[in-house]
A protein has these predicted regions:
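Phosphate/dinucleotide-binding and metal-coordinating scaffold of catalytic cores
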Residues: 25-367
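Bacterial N-terminal signal peptides that target proteins for export
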Residues: 1-10
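Sec/Tat signal peptide C-region and signal peptidase I cleavage site
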Residues: 20-24
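Bacterial N-terminal signal peptides
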Residues: 9-18
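Generic alpha-helical structural signal
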Residues: 18-19, 263
Length: 367
């Protein structure tokens, strides 16, 4: 089986399964192969071997960790190309044994790097030193932490993590993520912060390899450069969560995975400016025809509209599973008021799907 036929198989399976389980919906017919996109034969495969899913992503259970580093030096790094610092993770493994894993860590990001007391972090593990631990084969995950040291910031992180979980339910063409409960310990002073929830998500280049391609670093991809089926799912997800702070053209909060076939698969990430999270610091681009972050705006290209009905069936099929995320052990970490508001926001989205033409008319690229 070629890479092209394999990638197509995974995408088609996702859409067909979604359609088959959607209540009172007809099973959509398979589209002709006009998109030329194929899914990887094995979505857990890494380059050169058939490795299993790394331990870090194989479990959904929150992971208790302590990060020991020179926190003062680390947190004062506010430049785009900050240096790595030596650090270590300690945790208790499944057998109850304490584990310590050395790593390198540095700050990264744009808005959160400049404005947050706790900037996002990029982690870098040595596979040799991480062998036998939960971080073996994790490579270079990113860490999203509460922006400030307050309860609202921690709730924002939990809300954003839920969106990564939803995206993974919808499509494997998304970042894997894992919730953590982390304690930051300063190696210089011996002092430790209060533990807080954060999450790790898959490195973009690692994700691209998993999907059978490479990360596209050249900006400027237009509507004809994106696979329309995958783009329809990505844009519908952004519409669902009320996110307008992204651009696949500009590679801003959106990535492209380039396949050997020439196809480009858009993948969304970074959702703290979305209406679903509704952070106090989120704003709307004044050039857009909306005033509040909770307002939804369709930002897809018009040439992808034909692929939207199949994408809608996938979202409908996952509705129960999506709602269930807010009553499981992780969902219960959210405040009841946030759960109520979020489910009402999803209710509104699913009602809009009944009249998709209303929002598709605002597509970009009309003649």
């Amino acid at each position: 089986m070629t890479i092209r036929s394999a990638v197509r198989a995974l995408l088609a399976a996702s859409l067909v399964i979604g359609a088959a389980t959607a209540a009172a919906q007809d099973k959509p017919k398979a589209k002709k192969d006009s998109t030329k996109v194929k899914a990887p034969k094995d979505s857990t495969r890494t380059k050169g071997d058939a490795a299993k899913v790394p331990k870090l992503w194989a479990s959904a259970a929150p992971l208790e960790l302590t990060l020991k580093a020179n926190l003062k030096m680390l947190r004062r790094d506010k430049k785009a190309n900050s240096p790595y610092h030596t650090a270590s993770f300690t945790y208790t493994d499944a057998d109850g044994k304490p584990q310590e894993v050395p790593l390198r860590v540095k700050t990264h990001g744009i808005w959160r790097l400049a404005h947050c007391a706790n900037p996002p972090l990029r982690l870098n593990f040595s596979n040799k030193l991480a062998k036998g631990t939960v971080f073996h084969d994790a490579e270079r995950p990113k860490m999203v932490t509460p922006c400030d040291n307050d309860k609202d910031s921690e709730q924002y992180v939990l809300q954003e993590f839920q969106l990564y979980r939803i995206y993974q339910l919808i499509t494997p063409m998304s970042h894997r993520a894992r919730l953590i409960r982390i304690t930051f310990a300063d190696s210089a002073t011996g002092k430790a912060d209060a533990p807080k929830y954060a999450f790790l998500f898959e490195d973009p280049e690692v994700m691209a390899v998993r999907l059978g391609g490479t990360l596209v670093k050249q900006k400027g991809a237009g509507p004809d450069d994106l696979n329309p089926d995958v783009a329809a799912i990505a844009y519908l997800f952004e519409y669902m969560i009320g996110n307008t702070d992204f651009s696949f053209w500009g590679l801003h909060n959106g990535e492209l995975v380039g396949l050997p076939t020439g196809d480009n698969l858009p993948v969304a990430y970074d959702f703290d400016f979305s209406g679903a999270v509704n952070t106090h610091y989120a704003t709307v681009d004044p050039q857009l025809p909306i005033k509040r972050v909770r307002q939804r705006l369709w930002r897809g290209y018009c040439n992808e509209n034909a692929s939207v009905p199949a994408a809608i069936e996938t979202f409908r099929a996952q509705k129960s599973a999506i709602y269930a995320l807010y009553s499981d052990d992780i969902g219960k970490l959210l405040s009841p008021s946030i759960v109520k508001e979020t489910l009402e926001y999803w209710d509104e989205f699913y009602k809009k799907l009944e009249r998709s033409k209303d929002f598709l008319d605002s597509c970009e690229g009309k003649n």
